[in-house]
Amino acid sequence: MEWQTRFSPLNLSTQDALPELSISRLDHLGMITMVGDDKKSYLHGQVTCDVVSLEKDQSTLGAHCDAKGKVWSVFRLFHHGDGYGMIQPKSAIEIELKEIKKYAVFSKVTIEESNDVILGVAGVNADAFVSALNEDAGDVRIINGGTAVKVEANRWLLVVTEEAAQALIENSDATLTTRELWTRFDIESALPFVSATAQNEHIPQALNIQALGGISFTKGCYTGQETVARAKYRGTNKRAMYIVKGVTSTALNDDAIELERSVGDNWRSVGTLLTHYQFSDNQAMGLIVLPNNLDDDTRLRLTSQPDCEWTIAELPYSLDDE
């Protein structure tokens, strides 16, 4: 439809000001919904976060793991319609849907992928924009055609029907952008992004889920809980997610972007970016899981561009979980 073609990339340098209000079409994200009499108890027994205590006006990050504690999905959970919504990378949903439904046959619960449109509202005027849709004070609000979910200060996710999305876009004077700007904000906030290529690779603590309030250590059993608890109480986790920044001589695409680290006079592979954002002035940034004992001044470089060195940037939060 015509409204879907109005979004365009916003090419920003590291020095450019951000829009006071932007709406991004987040077609790289999708949502799994869960409804039914047993939705709360079933989901509570599957994921790292505390579903039982989640209030109607709250959202939380969480992870869904396999029995060995490896992450299938990192999601934002909130009340949506008659059940729950779990926003996550769209590419991860095919496998995650199969895994999260594995034991659902024993419960009164319906789990499926949503067809709703996901938009990202950001900027100093974002809160006012959402308040015009619903003046309630909560971080999760019912709006026409769906739900508004606060991610952080001046940043909201809108999950709405296509008709509602069209009305929002046609009646807004916001800067309309494609997903890249939202990805930049997620990287700057160090919010983990687990696409299909990163599924079943890391435990939740390696993705900093504990530092973001996405793990409850008091909720009881859930799939992968033993590994997650062992990582906390026995210190078995040796990895964490970091922001990395550097220069790039050519455009970065959606192919796997490998990094190497300096080891003496040599270079050794250190991992693959989970996600990345490229500025218009040859600067770029990304998220990557690294050993958590690396020095802050460890030299990194792009494997495909050996002359382009990168560094580890400061996280916006502590890696402690309490």
UniProtKB/Swiss-Prot annotation:
Superkingdom of the organism of origin: Bacteria
Keywords: Cytoplasm, Folate-binding, tRNA processing
Binding site for folate: W182
Pfam annotation, one family: YgfZ_barrel
Chief localisation class: cytoplasm
Any GO MF annotation of the entry: folic acid binding
SUPFAM superfamilies for the chain: Aminomethyltransferase beta-barrel domain, Folate-binding domain
Any single Gene Ontology cellular-component annotation: cytoplasm
GO biological process, alphabetically ordered: iron-sulfur cluster assembly; RNA modification; tRNA processing
Subcellular location field: Cytoplasm
Family membership noted in the UniProt record: Belongs to the tRNA-modifying YgfZ family.
PANTHER family (UniProt xref): TRANSFERASE CAF17, MITOCHONDRIAL-RELATED
Function: Folate-binding protein involved in regulating the level of ATP-DnaA and in the modification of some tRNAs. It is probably a key factor in regulatory networks that act via tRNA modification, such as initiation of chromosomal replication.
Designated name of the protein: tRNA-modifying protein YgfZ
